[in-house]
């Protein structure tokens, strides 16, 4: 729609990929980011483009299939910022999910990823597992099941996407917070009111907060869940998934010439500064010590990262269990404002396409 000017609020991966879809459809796009592009949750992920093996246990097969297709899309961009790697799930006698269940899950994952050209999952002996993951806890170890996924440099890949858009004409305004928006397409920023043909609210964990401070009702609420990771000086060749007693999983992954360990799950207030608590750091160190020897020392921690994951729930259901809550996204249209709620890094392109569909409806294209 040549001449139609769309504002995208939020410079994380969802905002960037919403702008990508809108530019593809011929809109003029201005993107507003309060801080730096790809500077918040989008650079504090588990550094994976993945379908989410654990979601198969919850029966979310369609969501996993979509994410695996998007994983392939990102790989096919040929950026050099994403690459396949092998992930091991150690099997212990009397602990965690049984081996047959894990093997069945990885075989289904293979099936859903058909066409990706990644190697298939496999069962490994105890000796092979110990060679793949140096220092892994040996007591009760039976072996492992491995599957393939894709690791990425989230910040660099997100910035790559933004740079492609800037070359195509995206107007990008960093360091410019939006204080208020209106359903007629107006934005208030830097003491001025600007008018657009439509507005995309892609502010991640802060999306419903922005609506509330703008006086715009929304039937959905976002629960902010802080996920923290440790980047540590323990180079890894292959990844490992640690099963926890409460059913959660923690990743131990190769990242550059280091390793990344995470994530935690802690309810958070999006109005507070986003940083890992000492309790979360201690939790991750303790998890590593239970699974790998020698235990991590404090001086091996290179960086502590934290980001907020937005979990979508109906208003009045704020007490939902975030461990089993869906990571699927929703788009909500109110007048000329389209709000993107929830979603995952891997599926940001699809989320952007859903946003663009809503903008088309606002602008009379469909």
Language-model segment annotations:
Residues 201-216:
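Flavin (primarily FAD) binding-site architecture
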Residues 23-44:
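Glycine-rich FAD pyrophosphate-binding loop
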């Amino acid at each position: 729609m040549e001449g139609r000017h769309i504002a995208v609020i939020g410079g994380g991966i969802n905002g960037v990929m919403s702008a990508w879809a809108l530019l593809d459809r011929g809109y003029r796009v201005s993107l507003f980011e309060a801080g730096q592009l790809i500077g918040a949750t989008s650079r504090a992920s588990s550094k994976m483009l993945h379908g989410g093996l654990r979601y198969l246990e919850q029966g979310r097969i369609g969501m996993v299939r979509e994410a695996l297709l998007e994983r392939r899309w990102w790989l096919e961009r040929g950026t050099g910022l994403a690459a396949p790697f092998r992930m091991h799930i150690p099997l212990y006698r009397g602990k965690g999910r049984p081996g047959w269940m894990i093997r069945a899950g990885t075989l289904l994952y293979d099936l859903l990823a058909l066409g990706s050209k990644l190697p298939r999952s496999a069962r490994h002996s105890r000796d092979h597992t110990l060679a793949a993951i140096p220092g892994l806890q040996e007591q009760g170890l039976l072996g492992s099941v491995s599957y393939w996924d894709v690791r990425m440099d989230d910040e660099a890949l997100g910035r790559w996407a933004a740079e492609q858009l800037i070359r195509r004409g995206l107007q990008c305004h960093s360091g410019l917070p939006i204080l208020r928006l209106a359903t007629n397409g107006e934005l208030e920023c830097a003491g001025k009111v600007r008018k657009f043909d439509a507005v995309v609210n892609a502010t991640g964990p802060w999306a419903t907060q922005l609506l509330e401070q703008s006086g715009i009702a929304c039937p959905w609420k976002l629960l902010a869940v802080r996920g923290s990771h440790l980047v540590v000086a323990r180079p890894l060749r292959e990844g490992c998934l640690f099963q926890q007693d409460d059913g959660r999983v923690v990743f131990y992954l190769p990242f550059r010439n280091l390793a990344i360990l995470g994530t935690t799950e802690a309810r958070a207030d999006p109005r507070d500064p986003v940083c890992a608590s000492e309790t979360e750091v201690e939790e991750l160190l303790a998890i590593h010590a239970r699974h790998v020897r020698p235990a991590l020392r404090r001086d091996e921690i290179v960086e502590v990262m934290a980001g907020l994951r937005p979990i979508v729930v109906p208003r009045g259901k704020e007490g939902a269990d975030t461990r089993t809550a869906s990571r699927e996204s929703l788009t909500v249209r109110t007048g000329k404002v389209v709000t993107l709620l929830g979603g995952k890094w891997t599926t940001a392109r699809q989320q952007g396409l859903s946003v663009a569909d809503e903008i088309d409806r606002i602008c009379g294209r469909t």
